[in-house]
């Protein structure tokens, strides 16, 4: 019997997840299908109960449901609970179990381009929203000890740091102070929507004085190279856009559902082609 998987969100027509997962199923000769479900906020509970009743094997959760979905699940993974958001649900033994693969997916993506363990790195996070929170907690979870957070509103950065129970040395900074201190970091991670199409001329931080070998990663993938990445490249930095995070979080969800590890490079090249790269 064909296994059913999917993604719920609103809007959902733009999602690249069905193409990525269905190609992986086909490549691994698995009898499964991944479908995009448009689910409005007011019917989220009914939709989740319906998916469970249909016997869906697992599904992803995207905007605007990542927080609200938690009220309708049977169990929530401790890391997802700490992050306060779920983007992957596994249907196992009659229970819907929520996980967050956004942060862990990002960490795996970052590890793929780092020559040294992340635990030894001093990291600067730009932004203190939902994506930053997932990445901060996931970096802390793998043992990173130095993570500073820069945000337009410094109090929001302080709140994010205070919410983490792991032993992490963190300082909340203004974006202005972070700009001056950028040369102190091994890795800079841009987690805001600043620089996303169509406002491509914007950047949260002017890159001007990086240390040699700095990694600059941006979770945005439209455009492929944001202003901050272009500036970082000119400074000789190793750069990474948001495609890697998208692919790695999806691959981790796929692994959780099926027990099979998909071909990451195949997934990545497919997504790049679909985005017109």
Curated annotation (Swiss-Prot):
Keywords associated with the record: Amino-acid biosynthesis, Aromatic amino acid biosynthesis, NADP, Oxidoreductase
InterPro entries: Aminoacid_DH-like_N_sf, NAD(P)-bd_dom_sf, SDH_C, Shikimate_DH, Shikimate_DH-bd_N, Shikimate_DH_fam, Shikm_DH/Glu-tRNA_Rdtase
Active site: 66
Keyword flag Transmembrane: no
Catalyses which reaction(s): shikimate + NADP(+) = 3-dehydroshikimate + NADPH + H(+)
GO MF, any single term: shikimate 3-dehydrogenase (NADP+) activity
E.C. designation(s): 1.1.1.25
Binding site for shikimate: 15-17, 62, 87, 102, 221
Record GO biological process: amino acid biosynthetic process; aromatic amino acid family biosynthetic process; chorismate biosynthetic process; shikimate metabolic process
Pathway membership: Metabolic intermediate biosynthesis; chorismate biosynthesis; chorismate from D-erythrose 4-phosphate and phosphoenolpyruvate: step 4/7
Residues given in the record as NADP(+) binding sites: 127-131, 151-156, 219, 242
Keyword NADP: yes
Family note: Belongs to the shikimate dehydrogenase family.
PANTHER family: BIFUNCTIONAL 3-DEHYDROQUINATE DEHYDRATASE_SHIKIMATE DEHYDROGENASE, CHLOROPLASTIC (PTHR21089:SF1), SHIKIMATE DEHYDROGENASE (PTHR21089)
Complexes and interactors: Homodimer.
Function: Involved in the biosynthesis of the chorismate, which leads to the biosynthesis of aromatic amino acids. Catalyzes the reversible NADPH linked reduction of 3-dehydroshikimate (DHSA) to yield shikimate (SA).
Stated name of the protein: Shikimate dehydrogenase (NADP(+))
Organism in which the protein naturally occurs: Bacillus cereus (strain ZK / E33L)
The encoding gene: aroE
């Amino acid at each position: 019997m064909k296994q059913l998987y999917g993604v719920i969100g609103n809007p959902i027509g733009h999602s690249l997840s069905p193409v990525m997962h269905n190609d992986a199923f086909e490549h691994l000769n698995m009898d499964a299908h991944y479908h995009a479900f448009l689910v409005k906020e007011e019917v989220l509970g009914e939709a989740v109960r319906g998916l469970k009743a249909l016997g869906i094997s697992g599904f992803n959760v995207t905007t605007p449901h990542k927080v609200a979905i938690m009220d309708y699940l049977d169990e929530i993974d401790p890391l997802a609970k700490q992050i306060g958001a779920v983007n992957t649900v596994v249907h196992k033994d009659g229970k819907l179990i929520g996980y967050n693969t956004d942060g862990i997916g990002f960490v795996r993506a970052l590890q793929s381009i780092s020559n040294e363990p992340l635990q030894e790195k001093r990291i600067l996070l730009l932004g203190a929203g939902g994506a930053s929170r997932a990445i901060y907690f996931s970096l802390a979870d793998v043992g990173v000890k130095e993570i500073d957070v820069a945000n337009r509103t410094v109090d929001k950065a302080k709140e994010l740091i205070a919410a983490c129970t792991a032993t992490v040395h963190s300082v909340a900074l203004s974006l202005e102070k972070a700009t001056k201190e950028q040369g102190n970091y091994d890795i800079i991670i841009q987690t805001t929507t600043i620089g996303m199409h169509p406002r491509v001329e914007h950047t949260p931080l002017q890159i001007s004085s990086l240390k040699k070998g700095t990694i600059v990663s941006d979770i945005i993938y439209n455009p492929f190279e944001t202003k901050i990445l272009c500036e970082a490249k000119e400074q000789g930095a190793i750069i990474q856009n948001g495609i890697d995070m998208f692919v790695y979080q999806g691959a981790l969800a796929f692994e959780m559902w099926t027990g099979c590890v998909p071909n990451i490079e195949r997934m990545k090249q497919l997504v790049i082609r679909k985005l017109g790269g």
